[in-house]
Amino acid sequence: MITTIAFSAFAIASVIWMSVRTVRDHRAAMAERRGLLDDAARLLRDARITFSADHFPILAGSLADGRQIRAELIVDTMVCRRLPQLWLKLTLFETILRARPRIGALARPTGAEFYSIVHEMPRLLMPPPGDTALLMRGDGNASDRQVERTAAMFASLFSDRTLKEAAITPRGVRLVRQADEGQRAAHLLLRQARFSVTAIAPEIIRRTIAEAEVLSGFLADDEAVPGRRDFRKNAQRFLFQADPT
């Protein structure tokens, strides 16, 4: 009898301890998650950080030339038999609409990339040859020469296996790259998306911005679309649209 009571008390105490530990670990993870882009914020002018519904940070700021940058972190658990992915999605917004087509590429496509804008482009294009499987699409307004030049650029960019998506549009450019991969034990045993990264290194943000600037100046005339207004005054509105590009 005494043994049964003691065992029951131990079991109850263990459950309480595990519950308290789980809550404490969750709170610590949320606090750590919110600081992932703090170091990177120093790279931008007028940097400000807001938070998504799942407490991941969204960094917004500007470059020296006034163009706006938005960087956000996205958790992807959509693909079976693959560890959860933490993607860094960075968008560079032009101050004026550019006279260029929408064109982009997505690496190792599965069809489950809910964050992708390449999937929204209607025209299928021939991707460049290479070791990485690419889905290349556009809006149908690119010339053959533009498609060839962009394909060559993508072949170079996607030699980096961390790069998932690159897209050029009249309003801006976007890059998506892997920031971290989920912990195997947490995923297999607990079916949770836990990541080891405690901060996104400023070097990763700096490199991604540099690549975005190259893409921004890559296609055609780099001129404003005739009759369209200057977007500098309205940049903040575009920063917080779901898909501004």
Feature names for model-found ranges:
Residues I16-A40:
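Transmembrane-cytosolic junction motif
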Residues A28-M30, D46-A47, E165-A167:
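Short, mixed-charge, low-aromatic patches
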Residues R21, D38-A41, R45-F51, P57-I58:
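Membrane-cytosol interface segments
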Residues D39, L43, E72, L157, ...:
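Residues that form generic nucleotide/phosphate-binding pockets
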Residues Q68-T77:
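Long, continuous compositionally biased terminal/linker segments
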Residues S8-W17:
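Alpha-helical membrane-embedded segments
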Residues M1-A9:
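Feature marks short, highly hydrophobic, charge-poor N-terminal signal-anchor/signal peptide-like helices
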Residues T50-P57, S62-A64, V79-Q85, T91-T245:
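Charged, low-complexity intrinsically disordered regions
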